[in-house]
Amino acid sequence: MDHSLAKKIILDLCKHAFEDESIKLDVFGSIATGLALETSDIDLVVTGLKIEGRDDAISHIRTLKDHFEGCQYFSNIKAIEGASIPVIKLEADLQKLRENENSKNTSIVESEMRFLQIDITFEDSKEKKSDFFWEGFEWNTSKLHLGMKSIHLVKSYIKEYVHLKELTLCIKKLLSVRDLNSPYQGGLSSYGVIIMIVAYMNFFSLQNAWVNISQLLIHFFDFYGSKFEENKVGIMINRGG
């Protein structure tokens, strides 16, 4: 419910900021794939705006940031223009959202859950793009937003690889408690974790192995921590890992 309230207010702000009622707001990332922790942030993508290039995306980021700064529900608002896809990072105060929604009977949000981390990016949904997974990656494009495309890929992996979901959640939790889960600060993203696990399972033919999850976890860390030679080889999700 709190997530829906935050999304609704953000959508209203987007429509007001760009004076466009056709704008939509979609969820991608861990929330959409079912791989979210209790403390996971929400990844949102704004669609429906015409974006001709990176400069347009940055301009939209700045415009939206100004509108967020005037809203009492959001704080710690940052526009990261140098990211591969420009992004706004902010916190939503779920307690204030609840109080606004139901001022007469408002329950208290637990202190550690009160502030919801949200990332917002933009996608040009009015222009046809090539398919990343089936037509190849276009290295020279800065407009290609892969968040929505990756949802279907990750869900297919969860169905195909036994224990992928459990192993992903375990590793994400370990990264979270060590503050190593933010790629903007040198950490590892959820998608990066999934790619590493899939490559590992492919390499050792563990796609359908019904083994103890703890053994998989220990072997995973042993492989990447002790045996993987990052200066000689790379990580792939096809051709055996």
Model-derived features with residue positions:
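Basic, alpha-helical interaction scaffolds
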Residues: 137-190
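Helical scaffold of the NTase/Pol beta-like nucleotidyltransferase catalytic core
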Residues: 1-27, 100
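Amphipathic alpha-helical interaction motifs in eukaryotic regulatory proteins
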Residues: 11-15, 19, 61-69, 85, ...
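Catalytic metal-binding acidic patch
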Residues: 29-69, 116-122, 197
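Conserved catalytic core of two-metal-ion nucleotidyltransferases
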Residues: 59-133, 138
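Structured beta-strand/turn binding interfaces of compact recognition modules in eukaryotic regulators
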Residues: 26-30, 45-49, 80-82, 91-93, ...
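Beta-strand elements of modular eukaryotic interaction domains
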Residues: 12-17, 23-24, 31-36, 52, ...
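Pol beta-like nucleotidyltransferase catalytic core
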Residues: 170-173, 187-189, 195-241
